Amino acid sequence: MGIKYSNKINKIRTFALSLVFLGILVMYIGIFFRTHEVIMVLAMILGFLCIIASTAVYFWIGMISTRAIPVVCPECGKPTKVLGRVDACMHCDQPLTLDRSLEGKEFDEKYNLKGKKRVDG
């Protein structure tokens, strides 16, 4: 079948969700150190900072999501958002592009790189 691609917005949202779970896990581990107050407090603060970082990432991806170009996926027919020159459908992971020069070419996330590293095929 080939490499499975996923949508950039979904990747960042998954990262933010994992920060929430990591923060809760770190705080939960801190409870086991009730007898060592310093370790417990550090674990609670670290867990809290993970959750605050998650909030910042969710806010950031929300701002990016408002600027993303909405399109209808030709494969599944559902609305999705495209970031950059190439991206994948949020629902079916179908490779998408808005750049006519990339139509019919093999999907490569390197098309989104700026500068000298950019691949034009």
Swiss-Prot record:
What membrane topology term does the record carry?
A: Multi-pass membrane protein
Superkingdom per UniProt: Bacteria
- Membrane-crossing segments per the record: 12-32, 41-61
KW Transmembrane (keyword) present: yes
Pfam families in the cross-refs: DUF2614 (PF11023)
- Which N-terminal stretch is annotated as signal sequence? none
Instruction: List locations, semicolon-separated.
Output: Cell membrane
Q: Where does the UniProt entry say this protein principally localizes? A: membrane
**Cellular-component GO terms for this entry:** plasma membrane
* Keyword vocabulary terms for this entry: Cell membrane, Membrane, Transmembrane, Transmembrane helix
Q: Which family does it belong to?
A: Belongs to the UPF0295 family.
Q: What is this protein called?
A: UPF0295 protein BH0952
The organism is Halalkalibacterium halodurans (strain ATCC BAA-125 / DSM 18197 / FERM 7344 / JCM 9153 / C-125) (Bacillus halodurans)
